Amino acid sequence: MSLETLARRYGTPLYIYSADHIAHRLELFQKAFSTVPHLICYAVKANSSLAILKMLAARGAGFDIVSGGELERVLAVDRGAAERVVFSGIGKTAPEMDLALRAGILLFNVESEGELELLSERAAKLRRRARVALRVNPDVFAETHPYISTGMREHKFGIEIARARALYRRAGKYLEPAGVSVHIGSQIRAAEPFGAAAERVARLVAELRRDGHAIRYMDLGGGLGIEYHAERPFDPEAKVREYAEALIASAAAVKDVKLLLEPGRFLVAQAGALLSRVLYVKKNGQKTFVITDAAMNDLIRPALYQAYHEIVPVAARRGSRKMVADVVGPVCETGDFFARDRELAAVRPGDLVAILDTGAYGMSQASNYNTRLRPAEVLVEGRRARLIRERENIGDVLAAERRALKL
């Protein structure tokens, strides 16, 4: 089924994903870590579509969550997958802890002294034993956008390694110190920072074991990046192999430990595209603007992170000329753009364009800004395409307010 057919059937803006691509990327991870005990815990925040979670759960993947809502999504597709869930995040609430305790998740990644105390209280109240890993801050610099760098001491995440041993000693009766966790950021393309962080975690695991703690998990987080520029070489198999070799070598000094990995973007980003229809092409002085029916509420990465995405016409015209333009949406902000001063194949109103590599942090960050309706989503499996999320309608958007106001 062609992209134009999908766009006509389901409308635009429209997210489309390749199930085969996601499955292949998961296989690359499994193969790269096949020499050591491991569990791939997909980072739900990257793309929380129920259909994608279901296909990953069916392939034995675990899940990295950062909210009770994300846990509810995992439980909705496979309640048995709770035993493969790690719960990260710096602001877990008591109700979220209770939900996770009752579900029987694999591991709580604890990020502060206060969180450890609250989790101990909730576990005692429910009489549920909780396996915990302290997320330590390794003070490792990762070359990435500052908003998604998380492993330096000035960041809000984790606990100083120097304080970790003392906090483990304070684990209450219903808490089982079972692991150590680290996560240094997202969209990191070099292997060295991951290896440096893993080395520091491995040393801490050895110290904790000498203290008498039966540490059996090293959660080394996620963050492996992709290449968004089409002209730059990117070999995903070589990249994940290099990443795995760095982590395995750094953790080699620690025996009888299971590695937990939390890939998100690497699995799903390049599986997705956002289809959008060109509404207008206009000029302001020397500037050309391509106005699409997609906007920053559908894909905020360019506005938020100055992120680059390739934008291509779905049906290029023979001998079509090039144009230099800003590709923008209808939202009432100058920051509503997908590309600035971009050379692309000339387009005109009615043309369908694809914004590439939007399978991660696209729909999961979409909003209703300007009371715009969030897009539909389609999953392509082989030659079959199926709707996995209906396009929002105005009734969906207004429902909570109408109930509150009895309108």
Predicted features along the sequence, with ranges:
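A charged N-terminal "starter" segment
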Residues: 1-130, 169-176, 210-213, 383-407
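Conserved, mostly hydrophobic/aromatic
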Residues: 22, 45, 67, 100, ...
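Glycine- and other small-residue-rich loops at beta-strand/loop junctions that grip anionic moieties
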Residues: 41-42, 63, 88-89, 108-111, ...
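Active-site-proximal loop/turn and secondary-structure-junction residues that shape catalytic pockets
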Residues: 46-48, 69-70, 91-93, 112-114, ...
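Short acidic, glycine/serine/threonine-rich loops at helix termini
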Residues: 52-54, 75-76, 97-102, 119-122, ...
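Conserved beta-strand positions in the central sheet of alpha/beta enzyme cores
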Residues: 64-65, 109, 133, 181, ...
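Active-site loop/helix belt of alpha/beta enzymes
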Residues: 138-280, 370
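Charged (often Lys/Glu-rich) extended helix/loop segments that serve as interaction or gating elements
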Residues: 256-407
